[in-house]
A protein has these predicted regions:
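A structured beta-alpha segment of the ubiquitous adenosine-cofactor-binding alpha/beta core
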Residues: 1-37
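Hydrophobic residues in well-ordered beta-strands that form the structural core
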Residues: 19, 45-47, 215
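A short, small-residue-rich loop immediately preceding and capping a beta-strand
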Residues: 19-21, 80, 190, 194
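Glycine-rich, N-terminal phosphate-binding loop of Rossmann-like dinucleotide-binding domains
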Residues: 21, 68, 158
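Hydrophobic/aromatic-lined pockets within catalytic cores
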Residues: 22, 100-104, 172
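Active-site-adjacent "lid/gating" segments in soluble enzymes
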Residues: 27-145, 150
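Aromatic-enriched alpha-helical interface/lid elements that frame and gate functional surfaces
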Residues: 142-216
Length: 217
């Protein structure tokens, strides 16, 4: 039909075909890799799918891939389309890699990018224990948390020793060892400190002491 003809004309001069259909749908359209490569041997195909290999035809979406990796909390939806956005970055990387391979070898290839793999990659900090409740960036470190302030909230990211030392100084914390940042008493003292300060005051303190904090409503 006219659409197939128009597409073939475009593919004849294109470097890359980027698709996000399931493999079975691509084959029904006559756009499976074998058919594509035979007709357009210089064409690279970046095939964005839900899951890799034999699982690629199973239906799914950003939410299901995030849920599979334990990245959906309670009944709340994630604040962004993390698997989709991560998959877009992976597709960009795959495209550039395939173009370099073709430039050096003359060979075009199909490269699969799975959104579930992107979700898995994004979930690695949790799998490693970094963002679990007992992890340093999961809330266990008192200098890396969100606290209430007088008129909103404050995100505190004083993780590195020099930032932690600066925070301890302004908040008058008695920190003798790194482990002191992981005790409830330190968290409670910081909570009291932030609660009595406004967002404007905290912004001034942050600027004056080179502290990585950001206030929010």
């Amino acid at each position: 039909n006219a659409g197939q003809t128009a597409l073939a004309q475009q593919l004849a001069t294109a470097d890359v075909l980027l698709s996000s259909f399931r493999p079975s749908a691509m084959r029904k359209l006559g756009l499976g890799w074998r058919a594509l490569h035979q007709r357009f041997p210089k064409l690279i195909h970046i095939d964005v799918v839900g899951a890799p290999g034999p699982l690629a035809d199973i239906p799914g979406h950003d939410l299901t891939y995030m849920a599979e990796q334990g990245l959906v909390n309670g009944l709340n939806l994630p604040p962004s389309l993390f698997a989709d956005m991560g998959g877009a970055l992976m597709a960009t990387q795959a495209t550039l890699s395939a173009l370099l391979v073709r430039e050096h070898t003359g060979q075009a290839k199909r490269q699969e990018v799975a959104l579930s793999t992107a979700a898995q990659w994004l979930g690695l900090p949790q799998a490693w224990g970094l963002t679990t409740p007992d992890g340093a960036v999961g809330g266990a470190h008192a200098g890396y948390r969100v606290y209430a302030c007088a008129d909103g909230r404050v995100a505190v990211a004083a993780l590195e020793p020099h930032f932690a030392a600066a925070l301890a100084t302004v908040a008058e914390l008695k920190i003798h060892h790194t482990s002191d940042w992981f005790v409830e008493a330190t968290r409670k003292q910081l909570a009291r400190y932030f609660k009595r300060l406004s967002r404007a005051q905290l912004a001034t303190i942050a600027a004056a002491n080179d502290l990585p904090i950001h206030t929010m409503p």
